[in-house]
Amino acid sequence: MAVVPLGEVRNRLSEYVAEVELTHERITITRHGHPAAVLISADDLASIEETLEVLRTPGASEAIREGLADVAAGRFVSNDEIRNRYTAR
């Protein structure tokens, strides 16, 4: 993650926007040497907002933990198995 002074961002905003769109890295913008803002791509913001919405859903965190435990224990059906079940009909 890059840390860039506000004055530099002001002068090269278009370049920094292109950089975060391409790399999906965050840029911390400082004012008087202290973090003041963070520049991220619109796609990354949408992803963060979607994740927060899921985590706000009652029971979602527990369901995710249970699902990960099931996968780790081998309790899952692969895409190929599902495809074979439905194409065999």
UniProtKB/Swiss-Prot annotation:
Summary of the function given for this chain in its UniProt record: Antitoxin component of a type II toxin-antitoxin (TA) system. Upon expression in M.smegmatis neutralizes the effect of toxin RelE. Induces its own promoter, in combination with RelE represses its own promoter. Binds DNA in complex with toxin RelE but not alone.
Record note on quaternary structure: Interacts with toxin RelE, which neutralizes its toxicity. Also interacts with toxins RelG and RelK in vitro, in M.smegmatis coexpression with non-cognate toxins neutralizes the toxicity of RelG while increasing the toxicity of RelK.
InterPro entries (alphabetical): Antitoxin_Phd/YefM, phD/YefM_antitoxin, YefM-like_sf
Example GO molecular function: toxin sequestering activity
Name of the molecule in the record: Antitoxin RelB
Family: Belongs to the phD/YefM antitoxin family.
Keyword Glycoprotein in annotation: no
Additional remarks: Was identified as a high-confidence drug target.
Keyword check for Transcription: yes
SS bond list: none
Source organism (scientific name): Mycobacterium tuberculosis (strain ATCC 25618 / H37Rv)
Keywords from the UniProt entry: DNA-binding, Repressor, Toxin-antitoxin system, Transcription, Transcription regulation
Induction description: Expressed in log phase cells. A member of the relBE operon.
One GO biological process term: positive regulation of growth
